Amino acid sequence: MAKVYKDLREFLEVLEQEGQLIRVKEEVNPEPDIAAAGRAAANLGKNQPAVFFEKIKGYKYSVVTNVHGSWQNHALMLGLDKNTSTKDQFYELNRRWDKFPVPPNVVKREAAPCKENVIDKDINLFEILPLYRINEQDGGFYISKASVVTADPEYPDDFNKLNVGTYRIQVKDRDRVGIQALAMHDIAVQLEKAEAENKPLPIAITIGNNPLVTFMASTPVGYNQNEYEFVGALQDGVPMDIVKSDLYDHLYVPAGSEVVLEGHIIPRVRTVEGPFGEFPGSYSGARLQCEVKIDRITHRTNPIFENLYLGIPWTEIDYLMALNTSVPLYKQLKETMPEVVAVNAMYTHGIGVIISTKVRYGGYAKGVAFRLLSTPHGMPYSKIVIVVDEFVDPFNLEQVMWALTTRVHPGKDVSIIENCPGMPLDPSTNPPGMHTKMIIDATTPVPPEPNPRETQLLDPPDGTEEWEEKLKELLKNQNR
């Protein structure tokens, strides 16, 4: 069975043991040092480590960043060998996905580390959290890696409708934060229902979690699918521990969270939020967004504040929303199109997608692309969809480029679809939230399409596999 982590602390221990965590012992400034280190870690190019700051000027606790920021850390999160390939991680996630749902364990308050300390008077977020601007022109201090818990106000006791999502959070005052709830997000559905009755929406903002909680909070699953039950599935059937919110009986938070901010979204109130350096690698402008009143804070003793850097890809955010965007889309396509082999939606949260499929008949590849563009995530997010043959690895960009350069007839195989939904944080949307989409069919034509010339594939010479193994062994002995 794969390694299972109770909380962030257990995962950090394993990262350190595996050489995937760097400790910074000298005192650093919150700004610009924490964000600069997050960017620098991403720039290392391979085996990018988490960065753990032991001493932050003006703050008595520690900070960690880049926890999910490499394929090695991603593999360790799944309890795999750190050198497991991206493609193999995709198929392992796909296997575990089928174990959903695995209901969580609800523990008593006294058994939950997140309840060790309570602040319910004179709340001051500026004293409790090591706040800083992540990018220089951010409109304020941001919490960028929280897992936010809300419930459907129409069905508050329906656990399947409990939502755990990741949304950017701007700290605005001692006990107030702004939160971005875009129309395509589950939290926006719940907020709309609450505001229709002019009622506050209860909320719990959890910081520093089991890495799979953070992973699932960034994953596009169905509205009636509970993220905690997916965590249990990805833990290979081992349920996670949750505990009831102090303020709201129908909200549950991870028992091992480092910090939990409990409060409510104020109904029908919008204030300026942003600008903020977003995941596409550019600033999104200021917008009117909802505001949260924080009424209670619980935290572990000596809490670890976890945040992430967002910048020009790739940075930690790109690893955190890569395969967990790919697998749900793959599952949805596979339901009606069993010929689909794999989906690579790792680029900018699925704005760009590569699909590998066997082509059943003429025009089939385009149909697969349209199906992806009609999924709950693909409809607002995906803009460019490339479809390749089943023998092309969508995770190998060299193979994908080969397919593009040898299979695509620009006059026939490129489809442009105008007036579609678009991700408003994508800087190329105009107006924000509307887009033109593109499908590129890079598959080999099949009847009734006309057959192209000279597309018989070259088979490797006999003995190639044996020579691969022989050369590996010779290279290994040579480097001793």
Swiss-Prot record:
<keyword id="KW-0288">FMN</keyword>
<dbReference type="GO" id="GO:0018799">
    <property type="term" value="F:4-hydroxybenzoate decarboxylase activity"/>
</dbReference>
<dbReference type="GO" id="GO:0046872">
    <property type="term" value="F:metal ion binding"/>
</dbReference>
<feature type="binding site">
    <location>
        <begin position="163"/>
        <end position="168"/>
    </location>
    <ligand>
        <name>prenylated FMN</name>
    </ligand>
</feature>
<feature type="binding site">
    <location>
        <position position="185"/>
    </location>
    <ligand>
        <name>Mn(2+)</name>
    </ligand>
</feature>
<dbReference type="Pfam" id="PF20695">
    <property type="entry name" value="UbiD_N"/>
</dbReference>
<keyword id="KW-0216">Detoxification</keyword>
<comment type="function">
    <text>Involved in the non-oxidative decarboxylation and detoxification of phenolic derivatives under anaerobic conditions. Oxygen-sensitive phenolic acid decarboxylase that catalyzes the reversible decarboxylation of 4-hydroxybenzoate and 3,4-dihydroxybenzoate.</text>
</comment>
<feature type="region of interest" description="Disordered">
    <location>
        <begin position="443"/>
        <end position="466"/>
    </location>
</feature>
<dbReference type="GO" id="GO:0050223">
    <property type="term" value="F:protocatechuate decarboxylase activity"/>
</dbReference>
<keyword id="KW-0479">Metal-binding</keyword>
<feature type="binding site">
    <location>
        <position position="227"/>
    </location>
    <ligand>
        <name>Mn(2+)</name>
    </ligand>
</feature>
<dbReference type="InterPro" id="IPR002830">
    <property type="entry name" value="UbiD"/>
</dbReference>
<dbReference type="Pfam" id="PF20696">
    <property type="entry name" value="UbiD_C"/>
</dbReference>
<protein>
    <recommendedName>
        <fullName>Phenolic acid decarboxylase</fullName>
        <ecNumber>4.1.1.63</ecNumber>
        <ecNumber>4.1.1.61</ecNumber>
    </recommendedName>
</protein>
<dbReference type="GO" id="GO:0006744">
    <property type="term" value="P:ubiquinone biosynthetic process"/>
</dbReference>
<feature type="active site" description="Proton donor">
    <location>
        <position position="278"/>
    </location>
</feature>
<feature type="binding site">
    <location>
        <begin position="184"/>
        <end position="185"/>
    </location>
    <ligand>
        <name>prenylated FMN</name>
    </ligand>
</feature>
<dbReference type="GO" id="GO:0009636">
    <property type="term" value="P:response to toxic substance"/>
</dbReference>
<dbReference type="InterPro" id="IPR049383">
    <property type="entry name" value="UbiD-like_N"/>
</dbReference>
<keyword id="KW-0058">Aromatic hydrocarbons catabolism</keyword>
<dbReference type="GO" id="GO:0005829">
    <property type="term" value="C:cytosol"/>
</dbReference>
<dbReference type="GO" id="GO:0008694">
    <property type="term" value="F:3-octaprenyl-4-hydroxybenzoate carboxy-lyase activity"/>
</dbReference>
<feature type="binding site">
    <location>
        <position position="163"/>
    </location>
    <ligand>
        <name>Mn(2+)</name>
    </ligand>
</feature>
<dbReference type="InterPro" id="IPR032902">
    <property type="entry name" value="BsdC"/>
</dbReference>
<keyword id="KW-0456">Lyase</keyword>
<keyword id="KW-0464">Manganese</keyword>
<keyword id="KW-0285">Flavoprotein</keyword>
<dbReference type="GO" id="GO:0009056">
    <property type="term" value="P:catabolic process"/>
</dbReference>
<dbReference type="InterPro" id="IPR049381">
    <property type="entry name" value="UbiD-like_C"/>
</dbReference>
<dbReference type="InterPro" id="IPR053417">
    <property type="entry name" value="PAD_UbiD-like"/>
</dbReference>
<comment type="similarity">
    <text>Belongs to the UbiD family. YclC subfamily.</text>
</comment>
<keyword id="KW-0210">Decarboxylase</keyword>
<dbReference type="InterPro" id="IPR048304">
    <property type="entry name" value="UbiD_Rift_dom"/>
</dbReference>
<dbReference type="Pfam" id="PF01977">
    <property type="entry name" value="UbiD"/>
</dbReference>
<comment type="subunit">
    <text>Homohexamer.</text>
</comment>
